[in-house]
């Protein structure tokens, strides 16, 4: 046996047709940063604590129900970022051609007995010593983060069924370049500004592995709840504009947009929050220059909505991916 090198690792992903049924061959391979990749099978511990006349707490350990989690992240690539975005939101409508426009919003339904849950995904993990697939994974956390002089980065979290060993695939990675933050623009209340320096957008949904009694350890369903979108943005404080937006509850439209290239190979990642409620604004003097750090909470609205209902955020992603991944 040989000690395995971390840098041999890679992960792949594919949308499942049937939740919990593994897709043998990934449709995309996602470049990730090594220390962000954290797959884990989690058993509920069951302990026999029956008294037996001794100063012992536990006598037997039984593995209870099982689910798994898979965290990963890294630099944002305008094609593979679709998977966690669509996984959290549930709706990906494709239009145009070369580059294709993916409009991602919160999946809703007004139809009785409809399934409003997002799609589930199979995640493949090659970790040198072996290969495993993690099935039925629902994305529930996504964080986009940026600093003016760095790369656009993200973290994603998913929950699903237990892992299983798999065959080694032949990976094929994106040729798209990661996104440099300096290529972006920031718009507040319809006006483009140039004094925003750092920020993040966090999309979170509660997730619950639901267990039935059917002689299996795996969940009956991995269920995600309502979406909340929050974030922070730092501005150089040249005037009171952003502070006033907070004090007067203006709730300005916030648009963060990154576009690279032209023509058929152009890529774009744009987040729009039409009702960006400022929940806090702090004047910051830890540097040689004054900043104001704003916390925001995106409110549900019809402008950012998809096919049905409300949505607090809408993403537009342009790339060469021809089909929906939701």
Please tell me what each predicted stretch does.
Residues 1-326:
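Signature of extracytoplasmic/envelope-associated structural regions
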């Amino acid at each position: 046996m040989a000690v395995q090198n971390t840098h041999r690792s890679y992960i792949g992903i594919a949308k499942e047709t049937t939740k919990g049924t593994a897709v043998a061959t990934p449709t995309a391979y996602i470049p990730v940063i090594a220390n962000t990749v954290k797959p884990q099978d989690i058993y509920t511990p069951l302990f026999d604590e029956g008294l037996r006349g001794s100063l012992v707490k536990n006598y037997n350990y039984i593995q209870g129900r099982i689910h798994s989690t898979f965290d990963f992240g890294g630099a944002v690539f305008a094609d593979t970022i679709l998977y966690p975005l669509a996984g959290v939101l549930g709706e990906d409508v494709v239009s145009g051609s070369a580059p294709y426009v993916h409009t991602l919003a919160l999946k809703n339904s007004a139809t009785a007995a409809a399934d409003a849950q997002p799609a589930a995904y199979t995640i493949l993990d090659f970790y040198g010593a072996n290969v495993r697939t993690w099935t039925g994974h629902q994305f529930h956390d996504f964080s986009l983060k940026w600093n003016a002089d760095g790369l656009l980065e993200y973290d994603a979290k998913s929950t699903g069924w237990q892992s299983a060993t798999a065959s080694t695939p032949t990976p094929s990675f994106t040729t798209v370049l990661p996104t440099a933050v300096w290529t972006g623009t920031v718009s507040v209340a319809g006006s483009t500004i140039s004094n925003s320096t750092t920020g993040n957008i966090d999309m979170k949904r509660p997730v619950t592995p639901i267990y039935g009694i059917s002689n299996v350890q795996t969940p009956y369903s991995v269920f995600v709840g309502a979406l909340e979108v929050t974030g922070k943005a730092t501005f150089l404080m040249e005037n009171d504009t952003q502070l006033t937006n907070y004090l007067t509850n203006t709730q300005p439209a916030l648009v963060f947009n990154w576009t690279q290239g032209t023509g058929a190979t152009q890529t774009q990642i744009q987040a729009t929050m039409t009702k960006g409620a400022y929940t806090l604004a702090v004047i910051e003097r830890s540097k040689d220059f004054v900043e104001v750090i704003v916390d925001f909470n995106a409110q549900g609205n019809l402008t950012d909505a998809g096919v049905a209902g409300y949505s607090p955020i809408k993403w537009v992603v342009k790339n060469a991916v021809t089909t929906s991944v939701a």
